Design a protein with these regions (language model features):
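Beta-strand segments within the central parallel beta-sheet cores of soluble alpha/beta enzyme folds
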Residues: 40, 456-457, 498-501, 516, ...
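N-terminal export signals
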Residues: 7-28
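N-terminal secretory signal peptides
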Residues: 1-3
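Short, well-ordered alpha-helical packing segments
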Residues: 9-16, 441, 484, 500, ...
Length: 898
């Protein structure tokens, strides 16, 4: 049955209901008179390359925030590597839990190890957890589950669209970040010497996640092959010398295909057991937490199926897939053979049980006018039999969408992209900076959306072993959080929804750890976690599992969302998590004889490990800064909500009296250290010594400026190995007003891949790395989605508001002329301003919640404030170089020279 455009749009819109409910206050605002067209500017920054580009890391990245596609071009084919945010091998071997010591028992073990080191006359020994035999034995025991190859993101397979390279040559490929459309131009020169061009178009539909591939004229494609990923893992994740587990493979995927009148269809079903094998239980039974995914592809035209039964039989075999001559045998899959040139259309749909459940919940939400909290799906949810019927659902969706004109689908998707780009826009005279901002906003939109699973280290792009290092998991010591650093200032609050759901899913585990292991109230957040049903702490491993900073860091952006939106109803949902973190920290700190609160013992991220008698495990600067951040946030949150008055007083007392930041007189003057008694001039992996600036947000321009000198000196002289700081370090410099944008561009360029993404690349030996280190070893692990936060660095150069004072263009060294529209400021203000390279030339702001505004004076001369609506004057006061005035909700204000 032909589906009308209206019916299609109505059906597609259901997928966006929860997001709109979550962010009703963040809809695009009416443009100002000098409005920037973000969609048009994004279109100027297309990615263009000359194929072939067969390598994954040359491939063009597409996505809709859930489904991800990496498009690669060989001389003989276009390949689409398909991934999805919630497609994971979810197995966890839970046998380690019985070995995990309580915190008191761990401290006793640490004390014994310290005595052993001193007995050996090695009082300066580092990493006791791996250097002392009995401590190493414990460490290896509790790390055994993490050393297994699972869990990990599971690729959804690869589609290869083949042509005869004698007659067809790929010429040019482009990716339009404005609309997410990928285009490949082919030159056709057939045996009759007739030449023409053929254009392939591919996009991932914003609303439905449909992967669409079409041609503009009949295409001489010889075959379409689908190759599912198979579990043949034999090595452990990066970070361990070797795996101590005999590989136990996932069940093989089930494939099928059929050809009909004017179409062909192929499918893959992959079952995911939730329980991993252990020596005691090598073949775990099915459980109610098991999951799966299904992929269905539907081709228009005439196709024949080749070798299906043989390939199904091969997949039914147990053990490794037998290799042919030289190991080059075609992997088992689906092979569809084409004939004469024909109009080409391929629809691909991937479905998980989460999709089916979410669609039902969104339909129910759309059918009521009641205010409901955003939909959240717990990771240990037991899916019903209907929700597990993903194959039938995928087939139904592929068939439904195949009868809708592809132009209608693309138009609907493009409309959603236009809405995305309407939320904020920037324009730089320096087009390199502009390109960084727009391309990375595009990449963020490809891996973040309300309702999807938060991206792990490598997001929703993977194939084979790519994207599986460290299990592709959530690292809570910056990697996971960094993805979201810029979403608020960019006015994409909706993109934070997956992280909020992640924190909700970590709460039970974190509260259990605090209670059962630490014997303390509240919640202690894990170092590493997976989007899987298992509720055990997957990495209770010394030393990194004992970084106290990870608890406040895990919760930080929950407070940011309130700070930037002033949404009290949201705060009511976030507050229990914020409070739990504060309760743990308040119970963990110790008051010293100096009347200061100390954090002892703790661990500095990836530096010293456990040391003798806590020598380098005292008062980590990251712990102090983030603990202060969270306690001050919870004091304010509890005041807003009128809650926990008694605890509030203690939180404030601790926050106001934490130990001073560790420091030392180094060769360049006084600088901060990561921990008490650390040596000067250490080479760090992250700019941990700048934690009071960021992420702590305790020191900055106009904020505790008595510490600005030491902060800027530390930033200027800190030694960093690279690989983890292409966003982190310049962000801090921008906060201090010392970022040279030319230097910033050079750092991004150093980490750039051909497909426009900046990956993690080592920069310096002498610390953990040596001259024999391959400086590119992380560049080939996967798509480091953490670096998509690069636009946030530029936002910080143009607008800062975290301190309570709004500052325009606080960092302009080699910035050049710049103009931004609707960047979001703390206090729920949408700000627009322009800078001509010398001074600020225009300012306007929209007040969403009617809060008072404090703005650093943009000019030394007199100024006036007026309402945009009727040009009526607004009175203001001045204080310490700032203007202060009240605002009305929904009103736009102009600030001008008098």
């Amino acid at each position: 049955m032909k589906i009308s455009r209206r019916e299609f749009i109505q059906t597609s819109a259901v997928a966006s209901v929860a997001g709109s409910m979550l962010n009703a206050g963040t809809a695009p605002v009416a443009p100002t008179g000098n409005s920037l067209d973000g969609f048009a500017i994004a279109r100027r920054h297309q990615l263009v390359s000359t194929p072939p580009t067969p390598n994954f890391f040359e491939g063009m990245l597409l996505g809709n925030g859930d489904v991800g596609v990496c498009a690669v071009v060989r001389p003989d084919a276009l390949g689409l590597h398909i991934g999805k945010s919630d497609c994971w091998d979810i197995r966890v071997s839970e046998d380690i839990e019985k070995y995990v010591l309580t915190y008191k028992e761990l401290l006793d073990l640490w004390a014994r190890a310290s005595e052993e080191a001193k007995r050996r006359d090695q009082p300066d020994m580092l990493h006791l957890e791996s250097s002392i035999d009995f401590f190493r034995e414990y460490t290896q025991k509790v790390v055994s589950s993490y050393r297994k190859p699972w869990p990990r993101p599971w690729p959804c397979g690869t589609v290869w669209i083949h042509w005869d390279p004698r007659w067809v040559q790929p010429v040019r490929q482009t990716l339009d970040p404005a609309s997410g459309q990928y285009a490949l131009q082919l030159a056709l020169n057939d045996a009759s010497a007739v030449s023409r061009n053929l254009n392939i178009s591919c996009f991932v539909d914003w609303a439905t996640g449909l992967v669409s591939v079409t041609t503009d004229t009949p295409a001489p494609f010889t075959a379409v092959n689908y190759v599912p990923d198979l579990d043949s893992a034999t090595t452990a994740p990066f970070g361990f010398v070797e795996s101590q587990v005999t590989p136990s493979t996932l069940p093989r995927p089930e494939i099928d295909a059929r050809a009909g009148d004017g179409f062909a269809e192929f499918s893959c079903f992959q079952y995911f057991p939730a329980v991993g094998p252990t020596p005691e239980l090598p073949s775990p039974p099915h459980s109610d937490r098991d999951r799966n995914f299904s992929l269905c592809g539907r081709l228009s035209g005439s196709w024949s199926i080749e070798g299906l039964t043989e390939n199904q039989d091969r997949l039914a075999q147990t053990g490794a897939t037998p290799a042919g001559t030289l190991g080059l045998r075609e992997p088992p899959g689906i092979h569809l053979i084409g004939g004469a040139p024909q109009n080409f259309r391929l629809n691909l749909k991937v479905v998980t049980p989460r999709d089916i459940l979410r669609e039902r919940l969104e339909r129910e939400a759309a059918g009521t006018n009641e205010h409901r909290p955003p939909i959240a799906i717990t990771q240990d949810y037991a899916y019903s039999a209907d929700e597990l019927e993903t194959l039938a659902h995928a087939r139904k969706e592929a068939e439904r969408l195949s009868v809708i004109d592809v132009g209608e689908i693309f138009h609907s998707s493009e409309t959603n992209w236009k809405d995305f780009w309407s939320r904020s826009a920037v324009q730089f005279a320096d087009k390199d900076l502009e390109r960084i901002w727009y391309r990375n906003q595009y990449f963020l939109a490809c891996c973040l959306r309300p309702g999807s699973t938060a991206p792990g280290l490598f997001g929703n792009w993977s194939t084979g072993g790519i994207g599986t290092a460290w299990h592709g998991d959530y690292h809570m010591d910056y990697n996971c959080q960094q993805v979201f650093w810029g979403v608020f200032s960019s006015n994409h609050v909706e993109q934070h929804a997956p992280y909020f759901e992640l924190c909700q899913n970590m709460m039970a585990m974190s509260e259990k750890t605090a209670k059962e292991k630490f014997n303390l109230p509240g919640a202690y957040f894990p170092h590493s976690v997976f989007p899987v049903p298992s509720q055990i702490n997957p990495y209770p491993v010394p030393p990194w599992a004992y970084q106290i900073s990870e608890t406040p860091w895990s919760l930080q952006s929950l407070w940011w969302q309130y700070l930037y939106t002033q949404d009290v109803e949201y705060l009511r949902r976030a507050y229990p998590m914020l409070r739990s973190g504060a309760q743990f920290l308040a119970a963990f700190v110790q008051k010293g004889t100096d009347s200061k609160y100390h954090i002892i013992p703790t661990v500095s991220s990836e530096n010293w490990g456990f040391t003798v008698d806590y020598k380098l495990n005292k008062d980590c600067i990251l712990d102090l800064a983030l603990t202060q951040f969270l306690l001050r946030a919870v004091v304010e949150a509890s005041t807003v909500l009128g809650a926990d008055e008694t605890e509030r007083a203690r939180w404030k007392e601790i926050g106001d009296n934490l130990a001073p930041y560790p420091k030392i007189n180094g060769p360049y003057g006084e600088v901060w250290l990561d921990v008490m008694d650390a040596p000067a001039e250490w080479i760090y992996n992250i700019p941990i010594t700048l934690a009071p600036v960021f992420p702590g947000e305790q020191v900055g321009i106009g904020l505790r400026e008595e510490q600005l000198e030491i902060a800027r000196r530390t930033a200027r002289t800190v030694r960093l190995e690279g690989g983890n700081d292409v966003v982190y370090q310049p962000w801090i410099r921008a906060r201090l007003g010392t970022l040279d944008l030319d230097w910033f561009k050079s750092q991004v360029a150093y980490c750039m891949l051909p497909n426009g993404i900046a990956n993690d690349r080592v920069r310096q030996s002498g610390g953990r790395y040596s001259d024999s280190t391959d400086f590119d070893f992380m560049m080939r692990m996967g798509v480091w989605v953490e670096n998509f936060a690069l636009p946030g660095v530029l936002n910080e150069c143009m607008l800062q508001s975290y301190s309570g004072t709004l500052r325009l263009f606080p960092n302009t060294q080699n910035l050049g002329a710049a103009h931004f529209e609707n960047l979001r400021a703390a206090g729920a203000f949408l700000v627009s301003a322009a800078f001509d390279g010398r001074e600020i030339t225009q300012i306007s702001l929209l007040s969403e919640k009617g809060k008072q505004i404090r703005m650093a004076k943009p000019w030394s001369s007199a100024l006036r404030v007026k309402k945009s609506r009727d040009a009526s004057a607004v009175s203001f006061t001045t204080d310490a170089g700032a203007i202060i005035f009240s605002t009305e909700s929904g009103e736009r204000y102009l600030i001008e020279r008098a």
